[in-house]
Amino acid sequence: MRKIKIILLFIFIVSAFFSFSNAYATTNFNVPRKAMKIYDKLDLNSIVQSDNNSYTFTTSNPDVVSIIENVAIANKFGQATITVSDENSTDTISISSGYYVGIDVSVWNGDVDWPRVKAQGIDFAMIRSSYGWYDEYDAAAGKEYNFQYDKKLQRNVKGAIDNDIQFGIYHYSYADTIAEAEMEAEYVISAINSLGDEYINKMSLPVTYDVEHVTTLSKKELTDIVVTFCTKITEAGYKPMIYANTDFFINKLELSRLTSMLYDLWYAWPTSNPNFNNKMAIRGTDVVPIMWQYSWEGDIAGAQTSGGELDMDVLYMKDRVKVEVYNLDTLIDFYGVNKGETLDIELPQLEKEGYIFEGYLDQEDNLVDSSTIYNEDTRLDAKFSKIKITSIIPVNTQLEIDSVYTKYISFDILPKEASLVDETISYEVADKTILDVESNTGKILPRKDGKTTVTCVLDSDNSIKATVFVNVHLGYVKGDLDRNNLVDANDASIALEIFKSESQTQEDLKYGDMDDNGIIDANDASLILEVYKINK
């Protein structure tokens, strides 16, 4: 009795443990934010961590980001929140469709914790390189701009690169003359060169001229300074960009002149309620910058200043074109490509796939232990109780061919899964009451016992096709009561026992009803014995 009590106590503890574990199983996203290019797809399962096999996804804005079979699809520019839920927990992720989210940092942000920044979904960073310029005569003029590289430049660039965060450079300007603008350009180029080629070659965003220093210059004079700087940067092999707020872009610069020269613009317009579903234009104009500084109070931990401040930005992705691929009138798939760029779609090639046979007689009655047949019609003279045939179709679905009631087996080889096979190969089923094929996966959907053909057709050229004959048997070989794929003495023994104990066949034992009268009886046992004698 004591032993029984101990066992019961152990069972109770184990059950309680698993109940407790299940009650506190959680599902969450591995990042809080994710950027998607418009018309791209994202497998949501790939960014989920879960202790629970059962969870669902919902989207706050299906017009922007829709969800089909756990795949997020970016439909247009905007922001959407996707929620994952299981019976115990929920979590959310912010999807930015058509734009990246980033920060801009300098020495004032201290030692930025770049791994922590990356973990919070930051895609890019604008890093201050320097301010002013170096001139040995500045001291005499009362200016103190010597050696003004940002002291955290090297550290910040390395941190961004090490954490796969794209980055660019910005330089704070004090220039009041063309000559000073030239010196500032030379100064920022020297700061960039100090990084070394290993870092420079990984800089993917522009070199920015930060224009916000108070000035009494005219629009033309200040614009001349900006153009001078940008020209020097271009000549050095970098792409220039101009940072300014509304006052500077509208009242202190010739905006139309800058846009006509196709310079990238970075617009400072912080707001407490940013709208991410429309691109931000410079106030009072229809000019859309490529980058928008939307906040000075970012909440990205590990990058804030000592006062808790952090500049937040969005970088608009290039305009996208949707390319749709059709088979006649049916949309097969779609792709996104940057406007003005080309899209290469690799057409599939039908490739050979084999059938592996074990233990059959060839047409000269020679016993063959094992072989593989490729891309040809094949007829095998087989002893049905010995042959084992497994066919491999696209997506590695396995079908067991039932050979019990035929001596000769003929079939064509189904093509091997190739590039884009789901999008470019159609399946034709002769008798869909027996089986169907999922058009997008190539998986067989069996419906009832029977034999039919599946023809695989290359959509781009309907003359390229291959056919497989498929036998579907949802249960087991008739008479194979012990389910070892052979009808043998053990099956006969089982059949006799069933006959002695039961006159009516149980539903799950009907594969032993060899004469199809709905009852397992002496006749079935006799037939099983005959099959066994033939094949032992």
List where the protein language model places each region:
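Sec-dependent N-terminal signal peptides of Gram-positive bacterial secreted proteins and lipoproteins
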Residues: I4-Y24
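Cellulosome-associated attachment modules in secreted, modular CAZymes
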Residues: F18-A23, T467-K536
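Extracytoplasmic soluble-region selector
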Residues: Y24-G98, S385-D480, A489, Y532
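Secondary-structure capping and domain/repeat boundary segments
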Residues: T27, K34, R320-K386, S403, ...
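Extracellular/periplasmic catalytic domains that process cell-envelope and extracellular macromolecules
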Residues: S96-S97, K118-G121, I161-N163, E198-M203, ...
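Functionally critical loop-and-helix segments that line ligand-binding/catalytic clefts
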Residues: G98-N109, T259-R320
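Substrate-binding cleft of extracellular glycoside hydrolase catalytic domains
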Residues: Y99-C230, T234-A236
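Catalytic domains of cell-wall/extracellular-matrix polysaccharide-remodeling enzymes
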Residues: Y199-M280
